[in-house]
Amino acid sequence: MGSVMSIMSAFGLAGGAGAKAFVPLLLLGGFHYTPYFELGGRFAWIASPLVMVVLGVLVILEILVDSVPELGEYADTVAYLPKIVAGFIAFAAATGSIDENLTQLGVSGVLGGGTAAGVHWVRNQIRRPFREVAESLHDGAARAASIGEAGISTAVASSAILAPPVAIFALGGFALAGFGLSKKLSGRNAACPNCGASVFRDALACPSCGSEI
């Protein structure tokens, strides 16, 4: 399937797709024009100017959608599909396994898509407390969280291309830091005295029933 470094790069790119689906693909297209990375012939389409423009628009749309607290769990569920597909493409592009037999193509799909899905699941567990803060306090918190996820995806995917081992450690580090912060935020939640929904302790109103606290 490829060297150890290319496999590590593939996992890093797929992990980045789990944070934001289209960021790693856009970076793959961009790095294709540098001395640091070259897409295989079957993946050269990713570096097409038209495709990169479309990917750029999709990145912006994904950030905007994730910035809307009202979409919440619906967006989290729907996002599995594009992230699994993006993880598969990124993994296969890094290893070049689509040029091989169907078995290796299937392995790329399982590993790449599975990695992206796993990272997205972790992201969802971390994001829930942030979403409660965004709904209870200010919409800007949701926007900041979404932009932060795009930044993490960019950092992980870029390091996956330039220094693959760093990407693996970065994924673990971001996950641990995120879980720690989300646990801290979860501990600051309280029940709404009117409807019983979970709200941030400093909230002035309940996002579920709209009553003042």
Residue ranges: model-predicted function:
Residues 1-5, 31-50, 90-108, 159-168:
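Helix-coil boundary and interhelical linker segments in multi-pass alpha-helical membrane proteins
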Residues 55-65, 112-120, 176-180:
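Alpha-helical transmembrane segments of multi-pass membrane proteins
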Residues 73-85, 106:
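Cytoplasmic-side transmembrane-helix entry/capping segments in multi-pass membrane proteins
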Residues 85-97, 105-125:
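Mid-bilayer segments of alpha-helical transmembrane spans in multi-pass integral membrane proteins
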Residues 192-195, 206-209:
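Short cysteine-rich clusters marking metal-coordination/redox-active sites
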Residues 199, 212-213:
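Cys/His-rich microdomains that often coordinate metals
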